[in-house]
A protein has these predicted regions:
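Bacterial N-terminal signal peptides that target proteins for export
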Residues: 1-9
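Boundary at the C-terminal end of the N-terminal hydrophobic targeting segment
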Residues: 25-29
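Bacterial N-terminal signal peptides
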Residues: 9-18
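Cell-wall polysaccharide-cleaving catalytic domain and substrate-binding groove, primarily
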Residues: 32-279
């Protein structure tokens, strides 16, 4: 599919490319530090982030690496549930599995031809996917995803880091240096890196003007603005969690009454408070 190949190449080109990549066996022993525009995580720390993402998305189970949600028209694959569309799918979401495969291909990872970034998802719908769940083809896909967790983690981190420029552009000019410093403090620890990744999946980047109640957003940008000071180390993730609680409380307060968003407050708070836990 030429358009998919062009789109995938264009998106991959926007990612920072100086993060270290390694084979699965190297990942266990490589203690070199990744240094990329604020990312200073060792291979061991990145492994913790990857395990937490996998745990968060699918309980850390191998079966959870191949998933298809009820009511959706695409597969969700890998530790971060990258989306793979079958032929003819017309989705508002970004198809990320071909991007992931292109990323791994460019780093010398070998994979079965049918998984290549130019290909559509071979299962046309959820029913076909579930019928094939224990098939040799699906098992091959799961085994590949299980052994490439380090690459998936790098890809997710890079996509998150690529959002930084967008968030800074959306921030008031007078606040950019402070927001940049807070971002860098977060990405220097596995807890902070996970907090940014999870909150982005949870409530977005905060850069979309349409995602506002009474002019106030609730994404990463707003949480970074709400943080107090510029704490370092694990204190950065802890303050990010507290700031997120305040931002989400403001969202509930400003939401249209008919939405009754207060019913979600406890669950939201429980989720962000976990950012304080050591990985």
């Amino acid at each position: 599919m030429p358009f998919r190949s062009l789109l995938t190449a264009a998106v991959i080109a926007t990612l920072p490319l100086t993060i270290s990549s390694c084979s699965t066996s190297q990942a266990a022993s490589n203690q070199a530090t990744t240094t990329n525009a604020g990312i200073t995580l060792t291979a061991a720390q990145k492994a913790k982030v990857g395990r937490k993402i996998w745990q968060n998305e699918s309980g850390g189970k191998v079966d959870g690496l191949t998933h298809w949600n009820h009511g959706e028209d695409f597969a969700s694959l890998g530790i971060g549930h990258a989306l793979w569309f079958p032929a003819g799918a017309d989705e508002k979401f970004i198809e990320t599995f071909p991007m992931l495969m292109a990323y791994m291909r460019d780093r010398g990872v070998k994979y079965p031809a049918w998984m290549g970034p130019e290909n559509d998802c071979p299962w046309p719908n959820r029913a076909a996917f579930m019928r094939d769940f224990r098939s040799p083809k699906m098992n091959e896909l799961r085994q590949f995803l299980e052994r490439t967790v380090p690459y998936q983690t790098d890809f997710i981190i890079l996509r998150q880091q690529a959002a930084k420029a967008k968030i800074l552009r959306a921030a008031p000019a007078a606040e950019r240096d402070t927001i940049n410093a807070r971002w860098n403090a977060l990405t220097a620890t596995p807890e902070g890196m996970f907090a940014l990744i999870d909150y982005s999946n949870f409530k977005g980047e905060g850069t979309n003007p349409a995602e506002r109640y009474q002019g106030q957003g609730w994404g990463i940008l707003q949480v970074l603005q709400e943080m107090k000071g510029t704490p370092q180390g694990r204190a950065a993730a802890s303050e990010f969690a507290d700031a997120a609680v305040r931002v989400l409380a403001r969202r509930v307060r400003l939401a249209p009454p008919a939405r009754k968003e207060s019913r979600w407050t406890a669950g939201w708070n429980n989720r962000v408070q976990r950012y304080k836990q050591a990985l």
